Every structure is written in structure tokens, then in C-alpha cells.
Amino acid sequence: MNFAFTEEQEELRKTVRAFLDAKSSETAVREQMETANGFDPAVWSQMGEQMGLQGLVVPEEFGGSGFSFVELGVVLEEMGRALLCAPYFSTVVLAAQTLINSGDAAAKKKYLPGIAAGETIATLATTEPSGKWDEAGITMQAKGSGSSFTLSGTKMFVLDGHTASLIIVAARTGKGVSLFAVDGNAKGLTRTALSTMDQTRKQAKLEFADVSAELIGTEGKGWDVLSTVFDLAAVALAAEQVGGAQKVLEMAVEYAKVRVQFGRPI
């Protein structure tokens, strides 16, 4: 079995690295860390319009390129290497994968094209003040029937939650954990940016007070979808870390070549 990347995948890596070298320098990263939004909208638009990165794994029928998670892993490695400040993980890994795995054809048709084009910033809101990451930790209540519901409760540590135009929320109905789409500017939704240790990745507290929401997928089957998405997210985060570690190794090797100690090169 061959675990090496293909020529096409390495070419993708080369292209993405060149783009990020130009757009995500150390200076640019530090500048974006200090902004409220945490990213450069112009760069985000270029990622979608020129590079097609937001639509990389979105199926072609919804405006994407239809590549696999392997290609996404290559891109994420390079983003980790460059410490890119952008809502890519929240939009492409969390939200888009939730939609893709929801089995909801109407929701995919409605939301994925905007994500693929780089026009929609999206995120996934699951964690609550308890800090629990399992199914029992989801206690937010959803009231309603059919496809129309209202949500009340609080979500914490939502990646890019203060800037997302689409928020996919996990909440409970009488049938169990379900998934809902909420407009980022919906009435009754209060969004508060949080202070984070990793300033390249913004988070927010979201408070819902009878906020209108649209059911995604099958009512009561939300945790099945989330279990898959969380596994994919773990792989995606590991890819970012691999890229970051590779960059650190390269820097250490280069420094070792010029470092002199006690009158001799180390």
C-alpha cells in the first residue's frame, strides 16, 4: 500500500504554500490576531474566488470541486504551517461537513454553494457552559415541529461564532439531539467574542432567546452526524498540527546550521 501523496496532491500543496507565503506572513498573522474579526476579508475572498479552497471537498453538484478529505488534509497542513488566520476550520471542516453528512438534500442545496464560493462564513455550535463534549452535554432546548423551531440556551467556545453568517446548532427536541440552521443576525441571538489563548482562532459565546431555527436532517439523529464530524475534525486538527510541527522543525534545523556555541558550530 502506497501512503505517499500523488503528484497532483503535491502540486496542490505547492500552490497553497505559495499563496500562504504571500498572504499569511508572520507580520500578517500578528496583525490579524489583533483585529476583532480575526481574519482579512480580502484574503478570505481570494481563497474562494481564486483558489477554490472553501469548495475543495464540497460536492460538484453544490458548486465545489468534489475532492477527498486527503486533499483537504494537504491544505490544512499548509494552513497550520502558516498559522493562517481565517474561519476555514469552522466553515469548511465543521459546518460544511455537518451539512454534507446530514443527509438533508435541501439544506445542502441551500447552504453549500455559498460556502463553496467563499461567500458564507459558517460554524458549528455544540458545547455549552458545562464544557461537556459528549451527547449528554447538549441540553439546549428546541421547541417546534416540522422544519420550524425556536432555540433557547447558551453555546460556548464557538469557533468564529461572532462573525459567522450561518450557525449550525445542536439542540434537543423530544426525539433527541437534532441539528438546526440559524442566521447569524437572527433576532434574539446575542454574540459575545471570548478571549482565547490561541489568538489566531477566535471564539464566541452565543446566547439564544427564542431564536428562529430551521431543522437540518432528521429530528433526533443529530448526534449520529456529529459523531462523524467530530472524528473528521480531529483528523483535520491533526493535519494542521503536522504542518505547524514541520515548520518548527525546518526553523530549528536552519538555526542549528548557523548557531555557534563555545567557538564552534553546534
Predicted feature locations:
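Structural signature of FAD isoalloxazine-binding scaffolds in flavoprotein oxidoreductases
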Residues: G66-V75, D134-I138, V182-D183
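A short, Trp-centered hydrophobic/proline-enriched beta-strand micro-motif
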Residues: G118-P129
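Internal helix-loop-helix
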Residues: G48-K109, P113-G118, L159-L166
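Short secondary-structure junction/hinge motifs that connect adjacent elements
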Residues: T27-E49
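A short core secondary-structure module
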Residues: A125, S152-T190
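Residue-level signal for inorganic ion chemistry
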Residues: Q9, L20, V75, D104, ...
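A structural signal for short hydrophobic beta-strand segments in well-ordered beta-sheet cores
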Residues: M140-K143
